[in-house]
Amino acid sequence: MSRNSRKSGDFNLDEELMSKIAANEAGQPIGDEHEDQKELEMEFNEQFSLIENKYGIHPQLKRREELINSDVLLSVRNLKQFFFFGSGLNKTKLKAVSNISFDVHKGECFGIVGESGCGKTTTGRSIIKLYDITSGSVYYKGYRISAGDRWNRKEIKFTKIREVRQIKELREKRELLLAQATTDAQKTEINAQYEYDVLNVKKHSSNIISTQKAKIRQIKFDNKHTPRKLVNEIQMIFQDPVDSLDPRMTVEDIIQEGLQIQGYHNRAENHKKVVEMLEKVGLVEEHASRYPHEFSGGQRQRIGIARALIMNPQLLICDEPISALDVSIRAQIINLLNDLKEDLGLTMIFIAHDLSVVKYFCDRIAVMYFGKIVELATSDELFKNPLHPYTKSLLSAIPKPDPLIEKTRQRIIYDPSRAHDYSVDKPSLREITPGHFIYCNDQELENYKKELK
């Protein structure tokens, strides 16, 4: 893909250089627009590392190569999903998902658990691009399929504010020095130094703004030009089997709708595929001509599963697929999903609030609380060595089948204000043992290590 030359900040990127970057970047341009700024003559070999850091071209390429060459199918990095309400002084911000990162490996079932309102469903919807994410990136097969630019825009805003403040401080400093100067030569030197400092401040701010604008253009390009084939390989099973199906459409129309959107208009072939999907999920051909209200909750969920599977997905996001079903039906749906996973080689993200279900269905589990991942580990490790107080609280809520044990079961109440002191030492997601991550600060990390011993 060809590129136009770009003027930006400290660099004069000629067409030859940009073509090299384009070749290395595998066809993901950072844009054709440019800012009119003062050019400084720098040699390509001397400034190549600066260009990497400035535009994030090769780090992104490196990450893509790492993902393609590994078994990581989906990679979520620093995902933030905020919702805004009101306007002006009454504008409020809801942090549904706050800076989470995780990988999903090929063939595994990755569980996301937590109480209602913790952000697990929003995470799934953000991955599948039902929401425009606020900040962060989602990589699928090494390609960035979704990204947010709010942080970049805030950085531009704060850079402009810092520039004004710094120039104001320089001006006040100049006035003070001029008042103390005794000769015209000293005043001339003070004014020259002031102009030089102001120029440096503006140049530095201009470079930062140029960098962030380039990243914003890259994000817009990635969001707009994501290959449709990649997006189609990610499908979702929604939580409510009633509201997720159009009551005015027949089952056949519901299931084949995705095929028609993608340009498959051969009714005979589509009907054949619909029948195959119905049989896969335990329904029969006669059900294709019926409407959703004629089915039970479990059958409606099977229709939702068939609708997702007909697109031949590689990654299936299951958003609490059994929470709205009767207990007698839940086991059937879980067994069906497990069989489909084995038969079709699916990778799954299983969202639930019931740890007892996730334990037997998922390979790894991420526990979410108030938009953050507080613990992430394999299923066996999480149930054997739960460390975070919130994880312990969730596990203590699992009912016991033995009535005698159930009577004596001790519930653990999680109170963040009592369990943590983050006033000075701020927390982050840290690896305490291989594959086991905890959201904690330094002091808590040491305590958790002692607890494991």
For the regions a protein language model found, what residue spans apply to each?
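A short, surface-exposed alpha-helical micro-motif characterized by mixed small hydrophobic
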Residues: V358-Y360
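Charged, flexible cofactor/metal-binding loops and thiol motifs
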Residues: M1-V72, G86, N90, S146, ...
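Conserved ABC transporter NBD signature motif
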Residues: G136-A147, V201-H204, S210-Q218, R228-L230
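A short, proline-enriched helix->beta-strand linker immediately N-terminal to the Walker B motif
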Residues: I310-Q314, R330
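Conserved ABC ATPase "signature" region
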Residues: E269-E286
